[in-house]
A protein has these predicted regions:
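Catalytic-site microenvironment of enzymes
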Residues: 2-8, 19-127
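Bacterial N-terminal signal peptides
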Residues: 9-15
Length: 127
């Protein structure tokens, strides 16, 4: 009876361990937006490294403004999107990342034309 019980416990641990390990490596960063908020830590190659990412501009300063297909493009939106993508990759490799310029609503956007917003904050404070 003890042998059977021990076998069942071992089997349960073997079945549950991968799911637990996967959840342990799953992280969430709301700044990435709903579709990209969850990510997996796939490596510890940058463990112990800390990065402070600043996209620049934001709020009342959109940076350079251009036109594409009749629509305005604002530098700050593209710089912010790139910083989020870079930060996500750094986090996936075990780094600690601080996003200095933040926009709680934009997140990573997979569209060609990124609409301008003036919601950006600097570490939570209006710009």
């Amino acid at each position: 009876m003890n042998r059977l019980r021990l076998t069942l416990v071992a089997l349960c641990l073997l079945l549950l361990a991968p799911a637990y390990a996967q959840k342990k490596n799953t992280r969430r960063e709301p700044l990435f937006g709903k579709a990209n908020a969850t990510y997996q830590v796939t490596s510890n190659s940058l463990k112990g490294a800390t990065f402070y990412l600043v996209s620049g501009h934001g709020g009342p300063d959109p940076g350079c403004i251009g036109k594409y297909q009749g629509k305005e493009l604002h530098e700050d939106e593209y710089a912010y999107d790139i910083i989020l993508r870079l930060g996500r990759e750094l986090l996936k490799r075990g780094a600690k990342v601080h996003f200095i310029i933040q926009d709680a609503k934009d997140g990573i956007r997979n569209t060609t034309i990124l609409k301008n917003s003036k919601r950006e904050t600097c570490m939570g404070r209006p710009i």
